[in-house]
Amino acid sequence: MAKLTVKDVDLKGKKVLVRVDFNVPLKDGVITNDNRITAALPTIKYIIEQGGRAILFSHLGRVKEEADKEGKSLAPVAADLAAKLGQDVVFPGVTRGSKLEEAINALEDGQVLLVENTRFEDVDGKKESKNDEELGKYWASLGDGIFVNDAFGTAHRAHASNVGISANVEKAVAGFLLENEIAYIQEAVETPERPFVAILGGSKVSDKIGVIENLLEKADKVLIGGGMTYTFYKAQGIEIGNSLVEEDKLDVAKDLLEKSNGKLILPVDSKEANAFAGYTEVRDTEGEAVSKGFLGLDIGPKSIAEFDQALTGAKTVVWNGPMGVFENPDFQAGTIGVMDAIVKQPGVKSIIGGGDSAAAAINLGRADKFSWISTGGGASMELLEGKVLPGLAALTEK
């Protein structure tokens, strides 16, 4: 990576500003999935072990008006982080002002402070989300000229807490998580060990057009599953029953199929049901066509076998999007089958591009078998599209 990293700067005695991604799910004030906090630990620990004073910034959820602040404080995160680090985490509970400044100035080497939810600044004119110049300058002024961006999950956004701070410090560098995310995903797409197979699922073609186009150029095969299968089917005149379809994307699907040179591989059968919820019948289709009055909710057994074959010998695999409604045991066989086909390949570099695929791997007990699971759904999608991420572009060149 041609950007400076946290290892390239002297941190001792410095107030180091760090953008982390602590946007974790909370239920009744309790964190239900702490993966993002765990993922940030190596960078935080490195900073404090080097004698730096870590000042952490993160958003949590969406905050547009005062009422939205309810249940969005980072207080539970501060407590969880303190337990994981085995030391106190200072939490002033504000995003600016004398209370924050005094707490920062009182920090000693090796201490950690967490600023309140950066999106609380969005209540008064979207200052965080619109990268307000004054806010970026103010937050930058709280440190000693070093900013570490370790929030891959927001790297595709230009906000005050990443791009804004970066523009106003002497050195803006990548943390370990950001460095690893870029290394795994970008290298997989730009310089893959071949054969390189991409697997794309999820419900909408519209979400993945740019990704499919980019990967058709880069990958040896692109396997398609999930709800978007049926838009590709209908574009070819195949009966899809009541399956999900994007009528306004039929031409796009047809165009992608025509220019794919056979690289785009669609399922050959489906698991169909007579309703999405409250169904009374579930069965495998004979071939591609879905029965009238039914809808496809997973790829079928023949497709699982065909995808298994397509993955044989693969050395690089990037997977983004489940093959079916994996949350329901009746429609998770496709997602499980594809995961198992990926991880059994000898010496494969296997990467999950965040979002629902990451949830599927974790929920179905296969997370530890993958080389890398991205922490950022939207950011990894934009990397797979070949886009430049603003949060990364803003960092200091080596």
Swiss-Prot record:
Membrane-crossing residue ranges in chain numbering: none
Annotated binding of substrate, by residue: 21-23, 36, 59-62, 119, 157
Protein's gene: pgk
GO cellular component, one term: cytosol
Name this polypeptide is given: Phosphoglycerate kinase
Domain of life: Bacteria
Gene Ontology MF term list: ADP binding; ATP binding; phosphoglycerate kinase activity
Catalytic activity: (2R)-3-phosphoglycerate + ATP = (2R)-3-phospho-glyceroyl phosphate + ADP
Residues at which ATP binds: 208, 296, 327, 354-357
Predominant location: cytoplasm
Subunit text: Monomer.
Pathway named in the protein's UniProt entry: Carbohydrate degradation; glycolysis; pyruvate from D-glyceraldehyde 3-phosphate: step 2/5
Compartment list: Cytoplasm
Keywords: ATP-binding, Cytoplasm, Glycolysis, Kinase, Nucleotide-binding, Transferase
Enzyme class label: transferase
Recorded family membership: Belongs to the phosphoglycerate kinase family.
EC number in record: 2.7.2.3
Any one GO BP annotation for this protein: gluconeogenesis
PANTHER family assigned: PHOSPHOGLYCERATE KINASE, PHOSPHOGLYCERATE KINASE 1, CHLOROPLASTIC-RELATED
